[in-house]
């Protein structure tokens, strides 16, 4: 019997598929990554080829094992984390998708969403799925495929078609069609899953004309779903033992498994999740209620808020404003001035996300005086990321009644020490940056490792989650509140721009 020394995390993202091998000390041993094609058939439409997703993901698994010289019989289990909401429908007899995957960013089902609102279902959807009515989620995408692909509706009614988010599709392919399953975190992003009963919501399936027979079985995020022989030699079968959507996997990888623990992922936008434990909190402040993972990978509730423009606003300074040659330089220039000199940048380029949800707001720079230079604008742009994060955290605290004790952070922008310190100052809480920033892959690996007994419990992993640096707040309260009031006024200016346009 060969000793099983490793866990593999498959990280299927929006632009690339990755495979990450971890050892027993949660060190990353090997990584392999492949990008795949983004398909834009019409303005606002985004698709992927499901077969290409599977091909890139399975090849990274084989490649990363080969690169590290690790045999498949040394792998204790596989954890999967994935881009959420992206929708795949396939024929279970042929194994072929009936249409491309409709990606989470795709806006083609806006009309269907309007009809759901007109039918008075907004409140029902919020109460029972935790979500707002939006094309972002899977439900209306499934309906679109059944309504628009020739023969799909008939085949679905005849029980020939299956639906899955990306995790479900990968597991189905990796087990040669033996296992049709998803986990609670992915199911909670479909807009047809009832987060109170933890069952598919038959009322919403009926409303969208989706047969229940298409839907996968829903299980916890940490258990053995099936086995795969991909990368296996001589009949080796590797258990697939963990599944979580990318943001929930990051929350778990950051060890935010107890009520009141929260993380912020600073990517193109920012994704904030706060674990609310066994208590479902319905937001009155524009946040989503979703399912996350408790200590053993069981379902727990969370609040989620998204900021549209995080790192993307730094790219704007570089690409459009030409104020930076490299995004990394933003920290250097921001620290060349002591303050932003009363300048606020509101990067509402595509409207404002949580908690405002104002699609018509537009970007503004306010408070300019003759003494303002490019460094002030760079600094104010970085500050805007921290202010927007506070907007969401304030909403989370108001909804849940839970005071945040510390914020865990991950994503590209966390390397910016100025931003992290300012974030701590604005929130008046400590900001913890982990040493291993691959927290999404870590989360998937932890979930799989716990299910197969590779690790005994999260407490065994706690000492592996080493903090690289903690940023402590060090500004007086009066200054903090004064600055934040200025930000709120600046946001009103961004919103008023659209309102004034209506009056013309």
Swiss-Prot record:
Residues at which ADP binds: 14, 18, 268, 311, 412, 416
A GO biological-process term: glycerol catabolic process
Enzyme class label: transferase
GO molecular function: ATP binding; glycerol kinase activity
Domain of life per record: Bacteria
A Pfam family per the record: FGGY_N
Catalytic activity annotation: glycerol + ATP = sn-glycerol 3-phosphate + ADP + H(+)
Annotated metabolic or biological route of this protein: Polyol metabolism; glycerol degradation via glycerol kinase pathway; sn-glycerol 3-phosphate from glycerol: step 1/1
GO cellular component: cytosol
Residues the entry annotates as binding sn-glycerol 3-phosphate: 14, 84-85, 136, 246
Free-text activity regulation comment from the record: Inhibited by fructose 1,6-bisphosphate (FBP).
EC code(s) of this entry: 2.7.1.30
Record key words, sorted: ATP-binding, Glycerol metabolism, Kinase, Nucleotide-binding, Transferase
Keyword match Nucleotide-binding: yes
Binding site for ATP: 14-16, 268, 311, 315, 412
Binding sites annotated in the UniProt record for glycerol: 84-85, 136, 246-247
Functional description taken from the UniProt entry: Key enzyme in the regulation of glycerol uptake and metabolism. Catalyzes the phosphorylation of glycerol to yield sn-glycerol 3-phosphate.
NCBIfam families, sorted: glycerol_kin (TIGR01311), PRK00047.1 (NF000756)
Family indicated by similarity: Belongs to the FGGY kinase family.
Annotated PANTHER family: GLYCEROL KINASE, SUGAR KINASE
Name of the protein in its database record: Glycerol kinase
Species annotation: Aliivibrio fischeri (strain ATCC 700601 / ES114)
Lineage: Bacteria, Pseudomonadati, Pseudomonadota, Gammaproteobacteria, Vibrionales
Gene: glpK
